[in-house]
Amino acid sequence: MAINSSDKWTVIAICLILGILLAFILMFWLERFRVIIKSNAHKHDPSDKRQIWLEKYYLFVRQIYTYLVTHKVILTLIAVPVVFAISIPFIGMQTPASSHGKQTTQVSTGNWSKNAVAARLGFLACGLYVTSYFFSIKNNPFALLLISSHEKMNYVHRRLSQYAIMIGAIHGFAYIGLAAQGKRALLTARVTIIGYVILGLMVIMIVSSLPFFRRRFYEWFFVLHHMCSIGFLITIWLHHRRCVVYMKVCVAVYVFDRGCRMLRSFLNRSKFDVVLVEDDLIYMKGPRPKKSFFGLPWGAGNHMYINIPSLSYWQIHPFTIASVPSDDFIELFVAVRAGFTKRLAKKVSSKSLSDVSDINISDEKIEKNGDVGIEVMERHSLSQEDLVFESSAAKVSVLMDGPYGPVSNPYKDYSYLFLFAGGVGVSYILPIILDTIKKQSRTVHITFVWSARSSALLNIVHKSLCEAVRYTEMNINIFCHLTNSYPVEEVSSLNSQSARNYSLQYLNGRPDVNDYFKDFLHATGTQTAALASCGSDKLLRHLKSCVNTHSPSTVDLYQHYEEI
């Protein structure tokens, strides 16, 4: 069914949303070129610290924009009334004008009757739902153009979904009110009953999407979210014949995205070594994804969706890749929490050695597990560290979908980098450091602050950090804080070191973010700088507060935050 003239306002609304995003992409690339030019100039002439008045005004405006983007609640409070104000013109409806009760070919400028407005609200909600559906897919072209992850498009997806639900709810209650006033039979009509089902799906979607529910019961959120999405497709399709064309677009987008993801997953089925390092930490290592037509470029800081059939065929979970694109393998640091990760830890733990001393040095034993896809390899190594890893390594069949995220490392275009991580958040920051060092970059100085309570995790990353600082002329300062009950001095393998251009220090206690960031700002001056952080919500909120407190209005600082 083709879209006719009465759908034009909905189509205009969709085009307006996409047009705004395209304009944003254009501004993003202009900003990227500005950063590259300025960073190149600083690399060739470090003494030049001039900042013209036009740049100061631009950076002041960008600082306001950055504050809003990094504080989503405030941005949403501003966006909601603006969106509804813009939506008012789109709920008018052009209808044939009447002359003495007879329709003529003349078209009236608009019909603002209750029935017409209620109908327009329904079509507008339908159009917003289509746009929201587009921003929910993993293979999102806008994310690639913004050198970002599809997860950053989730903000657009969530806000559009909320607007669609609110406008759709107003549409539904408006028709219920109109039916109650004059046409009570409409309250039990087929179209209204389907509307009741849509309303029920809205309630389930809203409750399951609340941050508390999503974080605490992610697996339930995942199932309910997908079931409700499919339910919306079916019920809106059946609700009104004029909605069918919009739902066909959603189905096409869904089939394309799911088809690409399923194909990649089956092409990238492989065996991973899985080790339970500590009760709350899992280390995974496996071959890098195969290159194919449906494969995506791999950039530093990307993440991967994995499925372990021996645990569940229906659950996929995202994990950040701790290795760099130049490696022929991928590494994952997995924090053990409830649900999938806890079951994986239990599975691996049940297959590890019960008594390491019973292993024969000359023998290698492979124990087959009853579940398909899991082998346990037990072998003796010379060092205690290797013994723990090798003897406990379980071979697990994994389906990989990805990588997803930026196709290149945007941080290497900035002169100064401030990187901050908490716990397994290092899996996002470490590849950025290694990639910036290994590839040609415009960066001259890196400050990396990491807080972790796991000495085992510090040990795993220690070798990579040592390699990073030894083979570059770049100025690098790395501060690793052990926040456990015992001091870092008791971990003999963690030794601080320094040279002319680098410093790697292991310290006790929580880091003082304010001091580190103020020192970084002092070193940065007027040059291009970028901040990247990955950690818990509490850690990120503390860092944002620190940045807002100490950053001058004209600081040339790009900010990016990843929550784990």
Curated annotation (Swiss-Prot):
GO CC terms of this entry: plasma membrane
Cofactor(s) the protein requires to work: FAD; heme
Entry keywords, A to Z: Cell membrane, Electron transport, FAD, Flavoprotein, Glycoprotein, Heme, Ion transport, Iron, Iron transport, Membrane, Metal-binding, NADP, Oxidoreductase, Phosphoprotein, Transmembrane, Transmembrane helix, Transport
Name by which UniProt lists this protein: Ferric reductase transmembrane component 1
Classification via PANTHER family: FERRIC/CUPRIC REDUCTASE TRANSMEMBRANE COMPONENT, FRP1P
Domain spans labelled Ferric oxidoreductase: 121-254
Residues the record lists as binding FAD: H317, P318, F319, T320, I321, A322, S323
Binding site for NAD(+): L419, F420, A421, G422, G423, V424, G425, V426, S427
Known catalytic reactions: 2 a Fe(II)-siderophore + NADP(+) + H(+) = 2 a Fe(III)-siderophore + NADPH
Membrane protein topology class: Multi-pass membrane protein
Binding site for heme 1: H157, H225
Lineage: Eukaryota, Fungi, Dikarya, Ascomycota, Taphrinomycotina
Species annotation: Schizosaccharomyces pombe (strain 972 / ATCC 24843) (Fission yeast)
Stretches assigned to the FAD-binding FR-type domain: 255-410
Gene name linked to the record: frp1
Residues carrying sugar: N4, N111, N268, N360, N501
Keyword Ion transport attached: yes
Record keyword Transport present: yes
Functional description taken from the UniProt entry: Metalloreductase responsible for reducing extracellular iron and copper prior to import. Catalyzes the reductive uptake of Fe(3+)-salts and Fe(3+) bound to catecholate or hydroxamate siderophores. Fe(3+) is reduced to Fe(2+), which then dissociates from the siderophore and can be imported by the high-affinity Fe(2+) transport complex in the plasma membrane. Also participates in Cu(2+) reduction and Cu(+) uptake.
